């Protein structure tokens, strides 16, 4: 989204967070659970005290995955990836709005950080949904994929979730493919 954690958008601090995919850039399986100091202290003790929370998984402590995770965190500290993503997020949303906001089958465009959602509707004024059996979101997903763009269809809402390092030129190209794919499918109904 352009923030280190999605909860940062809501200005909340959870007591427990589970992290995985982004830790290794998605290349190796690893995950971790992060807690407040108070929760950590409640379970930290010598084994004999019987209050330790003992758990593990087959992929825990893999040296290669841990090394990759540390390097990803170093890169996020050293390079302005999140700052650039935050700077580019409004630009991307504006591109999508300019291209699709007035299109008669787009009922809403919403965003948080770099993630944008494009809602397809049968009637723009009433926001009437399409019958789910048509699967227009999925049809648009397949059309865009053939053109080199990966969208995420959840029903008739298309999620545009680009990489944090996407350039503005790549954004322009991706938004054009997205808009062309939407029009190609929807103009044929």
Protein language model features and the residues they cover:
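Conserved N-terminal phosphate-binding loop of PLP-dependent enzymes in the Aspartate aminotransferase
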Residues: 1-189
